[in-house]
Every structure is written in C-alpha cells, then in structure tokens.
Amino acid sequence: MRGPVCAITYRLRRAVRRRSSRTLNTWKEQNTLEWRKMRRFRQQISQEECLEVLRNEKRGVLALNGENGYPYALPVNFFYDEEDGRIYFHGAKEGAKMDCLQADDRVCFLVYTQGFQKEGDWAYYPTSVIVRGRVSILSDPARIKEQCRKIGLKYYPTEGSVEKVLRDTEGRFSVLALSVEHMTGKLVHES
C-alpha cells in the first residue's frame, strides 16, 4: 500500500507527463517576471508590515536550488539593511550553501513571527514574510566588515563584543547580500 505522500507524488508526476509541452511553454511565457498573486489576499500584509517583521525577527530560513534538483533550506541569522534594502547573511566561505549559490543565485527567504493568540481562541496568528531574489557574495573587505558589524549589533549585547568577534574572525567568513525582487507577507490563521 502506498502512503499518502507517495500517492500525491505519483499523481503529480502523472499530471505533469500529461501536460503538453506547448501548454507548459505558454504558461512560462505568460508568467515570465510576473509573480503569482496571493490566493488568501485578505490576509496579505503591507510592505511596511513585511519590513517590520524583517527588522524585528532574528532568524529565517534560506532556501536555495540545491544539488540534484533537490531544494536546500537552512536556518540563518540575518540583517535587513534599510539603507540599501538588502538582506545580509554571513557564513563559511565553503560548503553546501556556497556551492548552491555558485550554481544558481536565485533564492527564497522565509521569516515568521511566533504570533499571538486571541483571548479564548486556541489558534495562533503568526505573520510570515517570503522574499524572493538573487544573492551576491561580497568581495570588498571594508563592506564585509561593515555588514558584519550591522549583523553583530542585532545579535550581540554590546558594541564591544561585536568588535572583539570581528577582530578574532576577520577574513574567515563570507557575507551574502540578497537583493529583493519580490516580497509578500501575510497574517496566518492556524484554524
């Protein structure tokens, strides 16, 4: 007996095989550089509310186009820089994340809040933000240090502790900049 996931996968593959290449190509032509509209549009939040989530939350999930066609998603610390409108991450200079980005710079980044609970209601109301865009790897040492300082100030208790970490780790990590191409957010109702 097949499990529910296997049955769904089987049906999806069969549906894709049935779809003619002409229909698929027409769909691609119509949707080039256009983003799908949110189905639950009444729950959509404003761009300013999306930015507020990016400013306040400490962690998100960065999804990359991974090896062998499998998505690769990982939790990351981040900093939204209001001066240039980019989202910055830091990490090792080598590894799976960097290999994926070398092959394809398109990413999806998800951040969500813990949410709130209305009095007398069992459900939570988290807010989620999804950002799509392209990531570049910074190469200018001064810019790398500047963005690392900004990231550090979001997470470390004092500026002195940030400066110490920067001195101790200088040149041992990379900084990634996500240029936002599309951003949406919504207030999720779990019921």
Locations of the language-model features?
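Helix-adjacent hinge/juxtasegments
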Residues: 97-122
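Extreme N-terminal tail/first-helix region
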Residues: 27-56
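Charged, gly/pro-rich active-site loop segments
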Residues: 34-41, 116-191
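Short Pro/Gly-enriched beta-strand edge/turn motifs at strand-loop
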Residues: 44-45, 56-61, 158-161
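Short, solvent-exposed aromatic-acidic interface loops
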Residues: 91-96, 152
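Short beta-strand segments
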Residues: 57-93, 109
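Basic polycationic patches enriched in arginine
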Residues: 2, 11-22
